[in-house]
Amino acid sequence: MKKRLVILAALFATVCLAGCKGEEEQAPQIVTSEPSIQVINDTPAISIEQEEEADDGSHEGMYRSELTNEWIPEELKDQRPIAAMVDNEKTALPHYGVSQADVVYEMTNSLANDGITRLMVLVKDYEKIDQLGSIRSTRPTNLVIAPEWNAIVCHDGGPFYIDDYLAKPFVDNFSGEFSRVDNGKSREFTEYICTGDMEKLFGKSNVSKTYNEYHKEGPHFQFVSKDDEINDLSSAPGVKDCTKVELPYKHNSSKLEYDEATQRYLYSEYGQKHTDPGNNDEQLGFTNVLIQNCRYVKFDDNGYMMFHAIDYNRDGWYITQGKAIHVTWSKEDEVTPTRYFDDDDNEIVLNTGKTYIALVPDDKWSGLVVE
């Protein structure tokens, strides 16, 4: 599907000095606006349909998760996922509960400290996780992406740059009201979402626990349609072998290595395996890997920045089953899902399982290793 972009306006101006909220240091205030994008279709809109396999009765009371395509209890169908901001500084390790997340985003959180990253983890059945985190602050990029899942952002404050985004009607969030765990670390590394926290917060707020009017109907990802079906990318254009991915994140050196036995890409950082003591020390792993080349804007000299998560026809990779293909990605607005297309302009089909999505600064893209 071919489209044309018209970039109408993008304003970034320094106005005055202001402080940050919560844990963040001071930074000069600026007024920002996400580029206004008009998308003009050259071809008629194509309706996206997903073929469903016949239910033989073995999945009674279950439905396919919109996040992973796995069979999960029907009672969760209308429940909104959470998007938890997880600190990825080395001091915050080990992470708890992240290996049980459905989708994990990793993205540059600041241009300072060699481009330190932060995780945004999406979880549908959050009550199954006893302890998730540690929780840290959010950024504007997260508040642009989370609405495409109709997810509730769980964080602890953030710089004032997030204020205009938090005020948008399709952004719901809980901030700084989670459990504190005595782990021997300084206070900023002790906040976790623990059993009962979400129910307590829903009980004292007007935030809807179930999908609201901003939820986009239809599939978010295009998944394989049958239990035993696997997309091995064998017929995809430009397919190449890929058993190793090295992200150009200098601070933590994120890496994914393909494990043929489990057919997953296992995640490491800081030169060590990422294991989860909250889940029997399981190593974080993914069936699907998506990598996005992203433009960004630098807000100030303190390293605050924002990715252009709303953009069109940007480069990327889809990686699964020991193979990789070049893709292009597009996102039209906050509540519309990001779409990924192969080089024949077909929307990609993901395999059933967890997905890792990395946003890589365009000026670091050449340092990405996919081999």
Q: Where are these predicted regions, by residue range?
A:
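Positively charged n-region of N-terminal signal peptides that target proteins for export
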Residues: 1-5
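Repetitive helical segments and hydrophobic/amphipathic motifs
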Residues: 12-13
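C-terminal motif of bacterial Sec signal peptides marking the signal peptidase cleavage site
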Residues: 16-19
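Bacterial signal peptide processing site
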Residues: 21-23
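A surface/extracellular/periplasmic glyco- and lipid-processing/surface-interacting theme
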Residues: 25-40, 44-105, 112-371
